[in-house]
Amino acid sequence: MENIQERGHLLTEQINPNSQNLDQLSTVELVDLFNTEDAQTLKAIAQARIELAQAIDVTSKALGKGGRLFYVGAGTSGRLGVLDAAECPPTFCTDPDMVQGIIAGGAAALVRSSENLEDRPQDGAEAIAGRKVTEKDVVVGISAGGTTPYVHGALNAAKQRGATTIAMACVPAEQVPIVVDIDIRLLTGPEVLAGSTRLKAGTVTKMALNILSTGVMVKLGKVYGNRMIDVSVTNTKLYDRALRILEELTELSRQEAAELLDRSGKRVKLALLMHWAELDAEVGQLLLDNHHGNLRAALQAGQNS
């Protein structure tokens, strides 16, 4: 019993005075309370904007040089990291190895709670070793309360291997100091249901991960304007989206867009370059490869040649 760490002082564990009578509210009052409290997530993101921007810049540079991005967490934090990583291949046509989610307990913990596994820092360290993390990589440790041993074990192992380390926590640094390269604090206050960090802490973490991964992909040239030009055309919904992107950006008819997409091998970015620079698929792809997949740079080079 004497080895159990007292966490009552942590912001995420404190009692929210606004929800003291949660069990006595009408249903509409309960919904209104959640809505009011969730507004804190927007403020938290705004307060962490500089650190988020730093994380985007550092990570995009690392990935642009062949590095990888790892999210590490347990419970809700781990699931959110895995979710964000899983969305990168279909949205940005990235290799599944480029952005990876690591959760305490592995795949089984995605659907069944394995909270006891978060107390093993050695497991976090072993997960980093198993991925052969190097100085080229970026490791983001996600922990709402900032104290998760599994996450700390992973971050410490990543530092020893020379990787860039980023922390994402929902408690002030003075409550839980974490020695990392970039320290992102997302302070949303005590939860409506005391200690349930799947609520505001989970929501703000998802928002931050959305911004981080999307920002990185923008910097890597996987977006043109606000269109996902590296979308992986793997089902009818995404095929339709690819066609609409081509129609909107080229003013081609839907049939013409479909023919262009087919000639490009269903690669939207290449299709755009082929159309705008009047190139065939082979030359267009070579031009993209020579400009690290950046459409604007490849287009400028193609038009100047």
From Swiss-Prot:
Active-site residues (renumbered): 87 (proton donor), 118
What are the recorded Gene Ontology BP terms? Answer: amino sugar catabolic process; N-acetylmuramic acid catabolic process; peptidoglycan turnover
Which enzyme class, named as a word?
lyase
Q: What does this protein do?
A: Specifically catalyzes the cleavage of the D-lactyl ether substituent of MurNAc 6-phosphate, producing GlcNAc 6-phosphate and D-lactate.
Q: Any additional notes?
A: A lyase-type mechanism (elimination/hydration) is suggested for the cleavage of the lactyl ether bond of MurNAc 6-phosphate, with the formation of an alpha,beta-unsaturated aldehyde intermediate with (E)-stereochemistry, followed by the syn addition of water to give product.
Describe the subunit structure. Homodimer.
In its UniProt entry, what is this protein called?
A: N-acetylmuramic acid 6-phosphate etherase
Q: Which organism is it from?
A: Crocosphaera subtropica (strain ATCC 51142 / BH68) (Cyanothece sp. (strain ATCC 51142))
